[in-house]
Amino acid sequence: MAGSSTNKDVVLHFLTDVFVNHDMTRLDEYLRDDYIQHNPDCPQGKAGFVKFFDVIFRAMPDFRYHVREVVADGDMVMAWVTTQGTHTGSEFLGQAAGGNPVKFDAVDIFRMQDGLIAEHWDVADTFTFFSQLGIVQGAEDRQRKE
């Protein structure tokens, strides 16, 4: 289980550096050169990762992950996180900054190889996220109109 503990530590440091401190300068310490991203909205590789999150960080300068739980088993690591931020920066998904606060949960799953993140999958509550940004109508708004 020592490998699982080490893998868990790598993921925790990665999440803190990237999603709390917005530091993309150390990605070589966390991501393999052939890193595979399974989120269809995020381009492949390190450069795609940086591009994707640069847009989010510019739109929500206070974007942060709160790590709720991390579980490791062999080469797999799962993190349950709450994402929080405020759309006060640049345009995002066609929406001008409106000061909308966002808060939603996500689960990130990482496959580790040789101490680095080789693959990533995620499941995020994008309906809540997009509703809070005003991109889609939230369930509460629909019920009020009916």
Kindly label every feature range from the protein language model.
Residues 1-146:
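C-terminal and inter-domain tail/linker signature
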